[in-house]
Amino acid sequence: MKYFEFTFHTSPCTETVNDVLAAVLGEAGFESFVESEGGLTAYIQQALCDENTIKNAITEFPLPDTEITYTYVEAEDKDWNEEWEKNFFQPIVIDNRCVIHSTFHKDVPQATYDIVINPQMAFGTGHHETTSLIIGELLDNELKDKSLLDMGCGTSILAILARMRGARPCIAIDIDEWCVRNSIENIELNHVDDIAVSQGDASSLVGKGPFDIIIANINRNILLNDMKQYVACMHPGSELYMSGFYVDDIPFIRREAEKNGLTFVHHKEKNRWAAVKFTY
């Protein structure tokens, strides 16, 4: 297959901007992404490339005061998903208890929980601070026989770990069709059951739950907007873990959560990224 290589320059160039840009571009047909100096490099099949769609995605970019420009060239004839996986996705060990790797990795470190994923983008692999923060929470808390919702599941790495630790039943939801397909593949790779994957946003939560545990690793604006729907799926004693934002954003998250009846428990941080825990 023939691909285009797009180079996107973002201002400000932050991890949050690049994360959201990758999600937006994924909906526009892009398959693989590599963070680069000044922005993001992304690959899309030439047959699927619609420049009007790309321009509209940039025009409607959800983060205000962000400038995005791009150039593109015809990429060399190679499998860019495979290229990214082999050159940029390396095994990662979290808290000395959980190792995340792909099927092609050799000499993988041993850990209590061994998760195999075949991602096709640089998010949801465990390398990003927000993912590793939530993984740490899942490792530190009792999950056995607790129902769990993974909202904005991405690769479903969090739901897979939760299921390995005894959570059941588990539901994983993402708005992106690619994430749903990749989640199903990763769940099969890890031979876990009782994880139902579906496509949707917070509006799809109507009639679901209540859940003992909800995890949502998305971004600040979506979390603030969808908090009420999360709380509607909780019962007294339910736990809500959220990440995808910076430490400076915690007051905004906490204010909205407490307005909806949640109690702040704690926060953890890594390289300015934060994860918070609330109970209902």
Swiss-Prot record:
SUPFAM superfamilies: S-adenosyl-L-methionine-dependent methyltransferases
Catalytic activity of the protein: L-lysyl-[protein] + 3 S-adenosyl-L-methionine = N(6),N(6),N(6)-trimethyl-L-lysyl-[protein] + 3 S-adenosyl-L-homocysteine + 3 H(+)
GO cellular component: cytoplasm
Broad class of the protein's primary localization: cytoplasm
Gene3D superfamilies in the record: Vaccinia Virus protein VP39 (3.40.50.150)
EC number: 2.1.1.-
Pfam family, one: PrmA
GO biological process: methylation
Keyword terms of this UniProt record: Cytoplasm, Methyltransferase, S-adenosyl-L-methionine, Transferase
GO MF entry, a single one: protein-lysine N-methyltransferase activity
Residues at which S-adenosyl-L-methionine binds: 131, 152, 174, 217
Highest taxon above the source species: Bacteria
Family: Belongs to the methyltransferase superfamily. PrmA family.
This protein's name: Ribosomal protein L11 methyltransferase
